[in-house]
Amino acid sequence: MARYRCCRSQSRSRYYRQRQRSRRRRRRSCQTRRRAMRCCRPRYRPRCRRH
């Protein structure tokens, strides 16, 4: 439970940020996704092509 706790918080913040900053949606989503993925499972690293 503790492991997914951080992931959930990150996902929530990501949704709120997406609604607020819809213009920088791709750039923000990339960084937030990387952070959430690192928190949940540090072994998996998603590739961010559009930075």
Curated annotation (Swiss-Prot):
- Molecular-function annotations in GO: DNA binding
Per the record, the major location class is nucleus
Do you know which InterPro entries this protein is assigned to?
Protamine_P1
Q: List the disulfide bonds.
A: C40-C48
Q: Which GO terms describe its biological process?
A: chromosome condensation; chromosome organization; sperm DNA condensation; spermatogenesis
- Superkingdom to which the source organism belongs: Eukaryota
Q: In which tissues is it expressed?
A: Testis.
Q: Where located?
A: Nucleus; Chromosome
Q: Where is the composition biased (Basic residues)?
A: 14-30
Q: Biased-composition ranges for Low complexity?
A: 1-13
Q: Where is region (Disordered) located?
A: 1-30
Keywords annotated in UniProt: Chromosome, Developmental protein, Differentiation, Disulfide bond, DNA condensation, DNA-binding, Nucleosome core, Nucleus, Phosphoprotein, Spermatogenesis
> Of which family is this protein a member?
Belongs to the protamine P1 family.
What does this gene product do?
Protamines substitute for histones in the chromatin of sperm during the haploid phase of spermatogenesis. They compact sperm DNA into a highly condensed, stable and inactive complex.
* Binding partners and assembly: Cross-linked by interchain disulfide bonds around the DNA-helix.
Q: What is the recorded name of this protein? A: Sperm protamine P1
Name its species.
Homo sapiens
State the encoding gene.
PRM1
